[in-house]
A protein has these predicted regions:
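Extracellular/virion structural assembly segments
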Residues: 1-50, 55-287
Length: 287
C-alpha cells in the first residue's frame, strides 16, 4: 500500500504554454486554473492527436501528472514527454544522430511515458467526467513537458475536454494515514415532509469529503510541510489528495481534488509527545 500523496499545482501553474492545439473558447491555459468547468477544448483531427507543450521555466522534478475532469472515453489515451530543449519533441531534431522518439519509456535525453489509458481502471462509465493519473517513477526533472491526447479511430472529429492539469512532485509523508480515515459524499439536497405526510425534495449537487490524520513523534515532519501547505494553499486554493497512487481500481473513488475544509492545528498530546495533524479536504466539484 502506498502512502498518501498531497499535491499542489505550483510548478505547473507558473508554466508558459509554448505550443498548443485548442479550439476558440477552450484555450489550453484553462488547464492551469482551478475552475474545472472552464476547459481545454480541442478536436484532435486526422492524426487523432492533440498536444500542449509547457515551459516550467527551469528543470523541475515531476513525479505526478494529473489530468482532471476529462470527457475521455474508455479508449482515450494520453502521453507525457519531457525534454530540456524547447524543440525536444520534434522527432527530426531531438537527437543529434537523427534517431527519434520511440516506444521506450525513457531516453538519455528525455522522458516518454508512451501512450496509456486516461481511465485509471475499467468500468468508470458511471462518472460524468474522469480523472487521469500518471505516476512517473523514477521521478523526472526537465524544463519542457508535453501532454498529448490520442483518441480512437473514428473519434478524430469528436471534441475532447479537460479541466485541470497538475505536473509536480507531491508531498508523500513517510507515515501513512492513521486508521479511521474517511471518504464519502456530502449531499445538501433539501428533504422535508408536509403535515399530510407527503415528501418534498429539492435536489442539490453532491461532493465528496475526505478526512484523515497523520501523527508522528518527529516534530519537523509535521510542522514543516503542513505549514507550507497552509501558507500557500489555505482554504481557497486547490490541492489534490491521492490515497493510494498504486491502486488504480480505486483511484477515482479515493482521490479528491478540492480545497482544505479547515486548517487544523498540529496538536501535541501530553505526555505522549506525538504530534497529530488532522486534514479535511472537500471536493471542488463532483466529476
Amino acid at each position: 500500500v502506498s502512502r498518501v500523496w498531497i499535491a499542489d499545482p505550483l510548478a505547473s501553474d507558473g508554466a508558459q504554454i509554448v505550443e498548443r492545439d485548442e479550439k476558440p473558447g477552450g484555450p489550453a491555459q484553462n488547464l492551469l486554473t482551478p475552475q474545472p468547468t472552464e476547459t481545454w477544448t480541442v478536436v484532435p483531427g486526422p492524426d487523432r492527436e492533440a498536444r500542449v507543450v509547457f515551459d516550467l521555466g527551469a528543470a523541475t522534478p515531476v513525479r505526478l501528472a494529473f489530468l482532471g475532469y476529462t470527457n475521455a472515453t474508455a479508449t482515450t489515451q494520453w502521453r507525457i514527454r519531457a525534454s530540456d530543449l524547447v524543440d525536444g519533441f520534434d522527432a527530426t531534431s531531438f537527437w543529434a544522430d537523427g534517431s527519434t522518439w520511440g516506444d521506450a519509456s525513457t531516453w538519455a535525453g528525455g522522458f516518454n511515458s508512451g501512450f496509456v489509458d486516461v481511465w485509471p481502471t475499467t468500468g468508470l462509465g458511471t462518472w460524468d467526467r474522469v480523472h487521469g493519473f500518471l505516476k512517473i517513477d523514477p521521478i523526472q526533472t526537465f524544463r519542457f513537458w508535453e501532454l498529448t491526447i490520442q483518441v480512437a479511430p473514428g473519434e478524430e472529429d469528436s471534441v475532447f475536454t479537460a479541466g485541470r492539469l497538475y505536473l509536480g512532485d507531491p508531498w508523500e509523508p513517510p507515515i501513512n494515514m492513521t486508521p479511521g480515515a474517511s471518504i464519502g459524499f456530502n449531499d445538501a439536497s433539501l428533504v422535508r415532509r408536509t403535515p399530510f405526510g407527503r415528501l418534498h425534495t429539492g435536489t442539490r449537487g453532491q461532493w465528496r469529503r475526505m478526512v484523515f490524520v497523520l501523527q508522528n513523534s518527529d516534530e519537523d515532519l509535521l510542522f514543516t510541510e503542513t505549514a507550507r501547505l497552509d501558507r500557500l494553499r489555505g482554504t481557497s486554493r486547490d490541492v489534490l489528495v491521492v490515497k493510494d497512487i498504486d491502486r488504480p481500481s480505486l483511484l477515482m473513488e479515493q482521490s479528491v481534488y478540492g480545497v482544505f475544509g479547515e486548517l487544523d492545528p498540529v496538536v501535541i498530546p501530553e505526555p505522549a509527545n506525538v504530534f497529530v495533524r488532522r486534514f479535511q479536504i472537500q471536493e471542488w466539484e463532483r466529476p
